Swiss-Prot record:
Pfam families membership: Fapy_DNA_glyco (PF01149), H2TH (PF06831), zf-FPG_IleRS (PF06827)
ATP-binding as UniProt keyword: no
Reaction equation(s) it catalyzes: Hydrolysis of DNA containing ring-opened 7-methylguanine residues, releasing 2,6-diamino-4-hydroxy-5-(N-methyl)formamidopyrimidine; 2'-deoxyribonucleotide-(2'-deoxyribose 5'-phosphate)-2'-deoxyribonucleotide-DNA = a 3'-end 2'-deoxyribonucleotide-(2,3-dehydro-2,3-deoxyribose 5'-phosphate)-DNA + a 5'-end 5'-phospho-2'-deoxyribonucleoside-DNA + H(+)
UniProt similarity note: Belongs to the FPG family.
GO MF entry, a single one: zinc ion binding
Name recorded for this polypeptide: Formamidopyrimidine-DNA glycosylase
Species for this entry: Trichormus variabilis (strain ATCC 29413 / PCC 7937)
Active-site residues, as the UniProt record annotates them: P2, E3, K60, R267
Entry function: Involved in base excision repair of DNA damaged by oxidation or by mutagenic agents. Acts as a DNA glycosylase that recognizes and removes damaged bases. Has a preference for oxidized purines, such as 7,8-dihydro-8-oxoguanine (8-oxoG). Has AP (apurinic/apyrimidinic) lyase activity and introduces nicks in the DNA strand. Cleaves the DNA backbone by beta-delta elimination to generate a single-strand break at the site of the removed base with both 3'- and 5'-phosphates.
Keywords (A to Z) from UniProt: DNA damage, DNA repair, DNA-binding, Glycosidase, Hydrolase, Lyase, Metal-binding, Multifunctional enzyme, Zinc, Zinc-finger
Amino acid sequence: MPELPEVETVRRGLNQLTLNRKITGGDVLLHRTIAHPFSVGDFLNGITGDSISAWHRRGKYLLASTTSAAWLGVHLRMTGQLLWLNQDEPLHKHTRVRIFFEDQQELRFVDQRTFGQMWWVSSGMAVESVITGLAKLAVDPFSPEFTVEYLANKLHNRRRPIKTALLDQSVVAGLGNIYADEALFKSGVLPETLCTEVQLKQIELLRTAIIQVLETSIEAGGTTFSNFLNVKGVNGNYGGVAWVYNRAGEPCKVCGDVIQRIKLGGRSSHFCRQCQV
């Protein structure tokens, strides 16, 4: 699933390519991709004639503000891709939504697993009232509110493994399996450590590691282990420099011990028993 760095990479690409271009129409090939409004016709009527002022990111959500004061929301979920293409490009078999722009360009939503969603929120409506998941999000790791005190308060009363807690979007918005593993390695904390057992100094290290790992991945254009592509169809490069994620059985880059993998809360967790305690 695309996580914060991948979504941020897409956001930056969209801001470079799509702003202030008139939307001339669209085509919805899979109706359930449109979460709101209920009518696909209303969705297409809403976007047509409008233009995008800016793309924003909240956690793993993409939100486009428009010149009509409306919002276009997108969540990539597991396999979603937003690609900027010429309208005459052959359709990928997993194309779900096409948004046409002037100059024969289009924003194409491709989604193999079909869990991705799009929303059109008309002007005058609160975006959180329609995209209800936004109200449940924690603060962003790049927000000034993401302090050591904030993270400590979120973690200390939870009797569950630290890795599981970090995947909870009400604890840290945008963090997922890849970067939780990477941040825990960088901070020296084992993924199965209970939140109640994590010391304040470890939380300080963890907060710093989360920010550093996310920044490094954004600079690398995100991570591509399966489906992620940026808006130009290019893979992310963070996987080549990952410390532990997807490296089970390989030597630790710090101590040389073997990277291990366990299942924790139904998700794979990668770590080094020597570097993490």
